[in-house]
Amino acid sequence: MSKYSDAKELASLTLGKKTEYANQYDPSLLQPVPRSLNRNDLHLSATLPFQGCDIWTLYELSWLNQKGLPQVAIGEVSIPATSANLIESKSFKLYLNSYNQTRFASWDEVQTRLVHDLSACAGETVTVNVKSLNEYTAEPIVTMQGECIDDQDIEIANYEFDDALLQGAAQGEEVSEVLHSHLLKSNCLITNQPDWGSVEIAYHGAKMNREALLRYLVSFREHNEFHEQCVERIFTDIMRYCQPQSLTVYARYTRRGGLDINPFRSSHQSAPNHNQRMARQ
């Protein structure tokens, strides 16, 4: 378990508890989780070593128009990594469900409400794009960039998180390259439910040992943290052990409850070049 899994800030979350599903608009359903919980554990100061954002895709977004006709859309939300809070995913789902039987004058009104409520919960302005299904149908399914490190003939017997697996992992020639793995799996901090993801790592620095990196990523398999926290841990561990001159970590997780979360952290870039689905999304 994470060192902060029993933090008082988590005690009031609806996650892991039986809840009622509201169908009338209610922004009070949103629940924040302070980013400081895991950042204190990572010994991060107010001056963060990364930029970035958390990109959410909202697949179950529906409301009624003024005539009572249901509307459906797909939403894309970007929450800055500098925000005080991340948004707990079950509360996000419950909040979106509260739109289901509520009448709104226009799609713009829905988008404006989303921006206002999510920004208030995160503690910083978020961006929201509400798309029609026709718009989203044109979006391609893509793969991650660079070299996949998954097809290695190695034996693994331990699945407990171990950052020291990166010790000495970067001792090769200086390179600029992109690596990725589809074997990232961790567990929800509260419910222990599995979270499945793919992760792309772009860096400039001493060449990283593929076996060491894969063993490290697999060691998250029984680790309990939220998606955003895992990605920040990967970023800080690679910076600490491998000391690249530049680093970007971009994970795309499979959806749960009609939402997927795609955290992006970079030493030099505030947002990814794309927000396109992977095969498992």
Swiss-Prot record:
GO terms for molecular function: preQ1 synthase activity. One of its GO terms (cellular component) is cytosol. NADPH binds at S89, K90, R256, G257. The keyword Cytoplasm applies. It is an enzyme of class 1 (oxidoreductase). Coiled coil: none annotated. The active site is at C188, D195. It comes from Vibrio cholerae serotype O1 (strain ATCC 39315 / El Tor Inaba N16961). It catalyses: 7-aminomethyl-7-carbaguanine + 2 NADP(+) = 7-cyano-7-deazaguanine + 2 NADPH + 3 H(+). Residues 264-281 have a biased composition (Polar residues). Its EC number is 1.7.1.13. It is found in: Cytoplasm. Residues 262-281 are annotated as: Disordered. Catalyzes the NADPH-dependent reduction of 7-cyano-7-deazaguanine (preQ0) to 7-aminomethyl-7-deazaguanine (preQ1). PANTHER family: NADPH-DEPENDENT 7-CYANO-7-DEAZAGUANINE REDUCTASE (PTHR34354:SF1). Belongs to the GTP cyclohydrolase I family. QueF type 2 subfamily. Signal peptide: none annotated. Substrate binds at I87, E88, S89, H227, E228. This is NADPH-dependent 7-cyano-7-deazaguanine reductase. Pathway: tRNA modification; tRNA-queuosine biosynthesis. It comes from the Bacteria. One of its GO terms (biological process) is tRNA modification. The keyword ATP-binding does not apply. Homodimer. Keywords: Cytoplasm, NADP, Oxidoreductase, Queuosine biosynthesis.
